[in-house]
């Protein structure tokens, strides 16, 4: 029942109650309850619409991709290829250059703006050699004390048989393991999609930054809807449940900073570039001032806090002591 129709019925019942002197309060209250439900449904529909529009925005081909961010922010960039074990993965671009006065290593999971580019970049889904390339460059950055900038835009790691045969799970796990203890500043930026372990492999950092209209999730809304609702067409509802927007993740303490895009990266990327550059400058100045021990400890504490809810150790010990005392009193002779 529509909101306007319910309001008209309430007004009509009020008029009848006054004119006839009849108590219609129970029926009026019932309609008011329906009105509240209608308002809640409207709010839910609005939220679903807004969240899914962010998901669609994050996937737009017009949005700058990681290679565009590198081109805009990194001077004198020199690309370095290959993982030195199997092959060069075109889905991952990496190399060295300058951000302002800082020599940096920049690595990005890149997507294309055209069909041919997306075929070359495997639609932004890296193979194991892509993650091993990123880790090789990270070790090199540590050796030469260069900060690392990770730019992430991926629906997830490539799930094909060839990826499994070459050790995808191990490649991602090794990134998580070694990056958590790397003794050089790491800044990760989610520029578009941040899909599952494929994004997490470049997300271990001293500060995790998201562009305003980017998303980060353990699974795509379509995949989640297929599993939970058995219907991929309910992706919009799943997107709300996943809490995948930058502001959701900021409130949960998973993301550290959200970058204002202005009118949108697909409309005018320069505003987003400038705001991101300002944040990177601030972060590099701070993390470069820490010694290696302080840097790794900061990263450790940051990662440990994610998902932390409440320490119940004290309550458990107190409860155990009470139980022991009760049993002692019960059975003493």
How does the language model describe each region?
Residues 27, 31, 130-131, 224:
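Short, motif-level signal for alpha-helix interfacial/capping segments enriched in acidic residues
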Residues 6, 50, 106, 153, ...:
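Terminal peptide-recognition signature
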